[in-house]
Amino acid sequence: MKHGGVTKFSIQNLLGPIVILILLTHFVGGASTSLQLITQFALCLFVMVLALQVFVGNSGVLSFGHGAFALIGSYTSAILTAPVNIKDNALAMNQLWEPLVSPQVNVYVSLVISAVVSGLVAGITGSLLMRLNGLAAGIATFALLGVAYNVFFNNKEIGPGSQALPGVPWITNTWILLLLAV
């Protein structure tokens, strides 16, 4: 709600979607394995849509940067959680940069590290790109997304390139994903 040009926080606007998510997670996510997987993907998409809405809705500037930052975070998490023997022996990973081969952490530690890495990249690029507005901002952030895509999918020194990275563990608990989404 807006009062005099200032957005007023309403707890009902926040708790409504959270209660719906909790109920959907409880009833749909626990029904079967396939519905649990669909619920987990829906929670991931919910976070992406919410990230887009928070920025575009508040600033009015179209931005594709959140896709690039999610890409950076997911690749960071995948490289950190993949088993060392898979990174050593996988066909696409034989050119992997040496400091990326040896580290292996659990999923939750990798989420924190990947959030920090993508946050740093967002801070650096955001300080440059947020001086733009209108169509220029949309084009520049779309270019950032294109650069991130091409770097990660064509450079085999920092990841598997266009091939899949096997052995990355899943978070199988839908309640943990709900907590991360909220």
Question: What is each of the regions a protein language model found here?
Answer:
Residues 1-182:
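Transmembrane alpha-helices and adjacent helix-loop boundaries
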